[in-house]
Amino acid sequence: MSQWYELQQLDSKFLEQVHQLYDDSFPMEIRQYLAQWLEKQDWEHAANDVSFATIRFHDLLSQLDDQYSRFSLENNFLLQHNIRKSKRNLQDNFQEDPIQMSMIIYSCLKEERKILENAQRFNQAQSGNIQSTVMLDKQKELDSKVRNVKDKVMCIEHEIKSLEDLQDEYDFKCKTLQNREHETNGVAKSDQKQEQLLLKKMYLMLDNKRKEVVHKIIELLNVTELTQNALINDELVEWKRRQQSACIGGPPNACLDQLQNWFTIVAESLQQVRQQLKKLEELEQKYTYEHDPITKNKQVLWDRTFSLFQQLIQSSFVVERQPCMPTHPQRPLVLKTGVQFTVKLRLLVKLQELNYNLKVKVLFDKDVNERNTVKGFRKFNILGTHTKVMNMEESTNGSLAAEFRHLQLKEQKNAGTRTNEGPLIVTEELHSLSFETQLCQPGLVIDLETTSLPVVVISNVSQLPSGWASILWYNMLVAEPRNLSFFLTPPCARWAQLSEVLSWQFSSVTKRGLNVDQLNMLGEKLLGPNASPDGLIPWTRFCKENINDKNFPFWLWIESILELIKKHLLPLWNDGCIMGFISKERERALLKDQQPGTFLLRFSESSREGAITFTWVERSQNGGEPDFHAVEPYTKKELSAVTFPDIIRNYKVMAAENIPENPLKYLYPNIDKDHAFGKYYSRPKEAPEPMELDGPKGTGYIKTELISVSEVHPSRLQTTDNLLPMSPEEFDEVSRIVGSVEFDSMMNTV
């Protein structure tokens, strides 16, 4: 998509800024007609080089002539007139000063980019504000619902107290009247009738009050159910989905404390309702009557309250931290046999009476059908302490939790020789950890169970990359925790999904994810030149099939580069010095108009173990197309001996017997090499202690340094005029430094 096309999609307030960039000296018509051609030229270079500016000026006039011809074929007289007028104006204004035209065009394109960036930031801010506002409004709404439940419980508490007072008064008056009727003198009939009418009235008030209390409890349970459904079916589900994303490198998951607060308030409210129902039963036992609303509704109210509390407490039992080996904290859900792993459980209902009352047991592959239905499906035993009591003391935030820190898996070995004829390879075989406990209170027994996300069990660390690929693919595409047959028929992933997850793999271990250009290159590798966000990528294409003409799959190549960055290139990657994922064609397109000695850093596409190289541009001696030179890629072996910044600093090329020189001058687009990498150069080491080598005049070891030297034919260099012939002594010294490796076969020398 051209920059000019993107600008035309902006809101009117940004389009107005674009209009202000252009006037008669360089009209907008030319920008419109020659949009793509203008954007492909290096106007910054032209603005600083009169000869280059002159060439671009005449090229632009030629482009206008071509456009005029197209309008002629279309018989568009008005546009022909405009083109001729624009061309004459350009010739009048810039024929003698082409640099001025280049400066204007460069400035306009630069300002356009700023307008696009400002518009993008504005849209992101608007989107972020809208999203934040929506989330905040949703949180406020839930807060209001939870408070409403709590307030209604308190209201019912007061209503039951009023009911109890009314019933006590009614009972007292009934007994008083009965006692007076049994007295010797009796009660006057008129007085007796009056008191009976009063009791009748009180009875009706009592009946209405009981009906009112029962109705309010029913209403409370209705509101509680709606609130609880929002917590369980919306908030908790969203948290679990965010946890899946966080497990595979996505944004960190939100804290559970707010969710715990809501769950706890609702649970406390339901516990209070249970106490209120007990109170109503006590009142019923003291006094009941035909069609008593308490007698009629109490069982339904008990059952419904228990059902809501059971659903809430069972849903609140979650895996707060998924199974993970401490040795690989950024690769959760991949477990190696014989290596300890940790997992943390949490109860979102934080009631003091539950502290130290819930004993959690961990089980492996409980009720997993695949154990019997999938041929070759492995079975494992759990070693270590597999029971733990939940408490509030071990957690830093005081939550009710249980953390298993010393669990291990051991494979059950079947008698006979194990075959690998099953439909799933080891790293596609999904397993699960289940956790059980039981809540016991007077008149209340509830079984709790939760399950981890699927895990991959490996027996060798070399299986870790493939195992992690399975975890990525599953959690990117599935929200179900128990779909362990997923890889029998794994679905395809859309490039829009996979590209985001690939970027997470870099941003989760570095300070920088993948930008659009880098992702476009990877998309073309997987989908070809017509890659689109909706392009479908099969699982086998991502992880199992050799990519293009290479002898390794796409994911293992990415994983190797990740390891190379983490161990050897992290500061350079974080600073944005490494372009990394760029095709050779795109690389040459970027470098061809740059000044000699401009270079960029990219990852090798042909190295299975991950490698990085640099390519620089030189002007050809015959004035034709520029020459490009790429050094043999550096792997972890070379980078373990010498840091990459030092390699760039000391790199030399040698032609025949001339003095070696460093061809690397500017990091693309125009950053001085020492400015880009200087802070990473190794500092000089202290001189070694003198040693007696040849008597009293011995001065110790002679310091050596590892450098990279490439021999090239003189014709491949920009020029050899400035490479002075070396004396025999100088040549011998260089040969000594380089070593005995033959120059014609040498690329990197130790």
From Swiss-Prot:
Q: What is the effect of changing residue 708 to A?
A: Phosphorylated at Y-701 upon IFNB induction. No effect on transcriptional activation of ARID5A
Q: Which residues carry the post-translational modification Phosphotyrosine, per the record? A: 701
Q: Where is this cross-link: Glycyl lysine isopeptide (Lys-Gly) (interchain with G-Cter in SUMO2)?
A: 703
* Alphabetized Gene3D superfamilies for the sequence: EF-hand, SH2 domain, signal transducer and activator of transcription 1, STAT transcription factor, all-alpha domain, STAT transcription factor, DNA-binding domain, STAT transcription factor, N-terminal domain
Give residues where N6-methyllysine occurs.
Answer: 114, 175, 296, 366, 525, 637, 665
Result of mutating residue 600 to P? In IMD31B; found in an infant who died of a viral-like illness associated with complete STAT1 deficiency
List, for all copies, the residue spans of the domain called SH2: 573-670
User: Which of the residues bear the PTM Phosphoserine?
Assistant: 708, 727, 745
Q: How is it modified after translation?
A: Deubiquitinated by USP13; leading to STAT1 stabilization and positive regulation of type I and type II IFN signalings. Phosphorylated on tyrosine and serine residues in response to a variety of cytokines/growth hormones including IFN-alpha, IFN-gamma, PDGF and EGF. Activated KIT promotes phosphorylation on tyrosine residues and subsequent translocation to the nucleus. Upon EGF stimulation, phosphorylation on Tyr-701 (lacking in beta form) by JAK1, JAK2 or TYK2 promotes dimerization and subsequent translocation to the nucleus. Growth hormone (GH) activates STAT1 signaling only via JAK2. Tyrosine phosphorylated in response to constitutively activated FGFR1, FGFR2, FGFR3 and FGFR4.
Q: What is this protein called?
A: Signal transducer and activator of transcription 1-alpha/beta
Variant or mutagenesis effect after changing residue 724 to A: Impaired phosphorylation at S-727
Q: What is the effect of changing residue 710 to A?
A: No effect on transcriptional activation of ARID5A
The listed outcome for residue 708 to D is: Not phosphorylated at Y-701 upon IFNB induction
Q: What does this protein do?
A: Signal transducer and transcription activator that mediates cellular responses to interferons (IFNs), cytokine KITLG/SCF and other cytokines and other growth factors. Following type I IFN (IFN-alpha and IFN-beta) binding to cell surface receptors, signaling via protein kinases leads to activation of Jak kinases (TYK2 and JAK1) and to tyrosine phosphorylation of STAT1 and STAT2. The phosphorylated STATs dimerize and associate with ISGF3G/IRF-9 to form a complex termed ISGF3 transcription factor, that enters the nucleus.
Its Gene Ontology molecular function terms?
A: cadherin binding; CCR5 chemokine receptor binding; DNA-binding transcription factor activity; DNA-binding transcription factor activity, RNA polymerase II-specific; double-stranded DNA binding; enzyme binding; histone acetyltransferase binding; histone binding
The outcome of changing residue 385 to M is: In IMD31C; gain of function; increases phosphorylation in response to IFNG, IFNA and IL27 due to a loss of dephosphorylation
Disease tied to this entry: Immunodeficiency 31B: A disorder characterized by susceptibility to severe mycobacterial and viral infections. Affected individuals can develop disseminated infections and die of viral illness.
Modification N-acetylserine, positions: 2
What is known to happen upon mutating residue 727 to A?
Answer: Decreased transcriptional activation. No effect on basal sumoylation. No enhancement of sumoylation on MAPK stimulation. No PRKCD-induced apoptosis. Upon IFNB induction, phosphorylated at Y-701 but not at S-708
Q: Which InterPro entries match?
A: p53-like_TF_DNA-bd_sf, SH2, SH2_dom_sf, STAT, STAT1_C_sf, STAT1_SH2, STAT1_TAZ2-bd_C, STAT_linker
User: What's the effect of swapping residue 705 to Q?
Assistant: Loss of ADP-ribosylation and increased Tyr-701 phosphorylation
Q: ADP-ribosyl glutamic acid is carried by which residues?
A: 657, 705
Matches recorded under Pfam families: SH2, STAT1_TAZ2bind, STAT_alpha, STAT_bind, STAT_int, STAT_linker
Outcome following mutation: residue 665 to A: No effect on IFN-alpha-induced STAT1 phosphorylation and nuclear translocation
Q: Which UniProt keywords apply?
A: Acetylation, Activator, ADP-ribosylation, Antiviral defense, Coiled coil, Cytoplasm, Disease variant, DNA-binding, Host-virus interaction, Isopeptide bond, Methylation, Nucleus, Phosphoprotein, SH2 domain, Transcription, Transcription regulation, Ubl conjugation
